[in-house]
Amino acid sequence: MSDERDERTGLFILNTGNGKGKTTAALGVLMRAYGRDMKVIMLQFIKRRGSRLGEHLAAEKMGVEIVPLGDGFTWRSDDIEKDRQLARKCWETCQDKILNSDYDLVILDELTYALTYRWLSVDEVLTTIALRPRWMHVVVTGRDAVPALVEAADIVTEMLEIRHSFKKGIPGQIGIEF
């Protein structure tokens, strides 16, 4: 693994936009990296601790780390200060995994929301990503990525919603949405 790391240039990848597929695309990268014997982790900002969604069930079967750190917090919260503090705590965990671990791939799922709502410092996040080991890939997902994040990323993909079954009244489907 060290020889491969010596030859690797870590990428900063951003999946953003209002369409479906940001987390799903990041999970695809996770699968490819894991298949190449890379050490991988996905840290989820909004999904609740103890979540048992499809990706958590699959990760458990495979022995892959997908760690929900949130409590479902959103901008519609009853206690914004509590959510800000939780986002900060989530970020500290992410920062530790980026700076003090030997992961080859770190995915920060739904991080963009914490930046959009100014719960975290964009400069601090970008500095941490810049200070990662040179061989580490970082993927960030979420809607409404702030311009500085878009500018800093090596690869930016914007998911565009053209049509979604929700608008037809079809509820989220097991294995597709969760």
Predicted region positions:
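Glycine-rich phosphate-binding loops of nucleotide-dependent enzymes
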Residues: I107
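Conserved P-loop
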Residues: L11-L99
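Short glycine- and Lys/Arg-enriched binding-loop motifs that mark or flank ligand-binding interfaces
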Residues: D6, N15-G17, T24, V138, ...
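Generic detector of well-ordered alpha-helical packing
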Residues: F45, E110-L111
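Extreme N-terminal, non-catalytic leader segments
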Residues: M1-L11
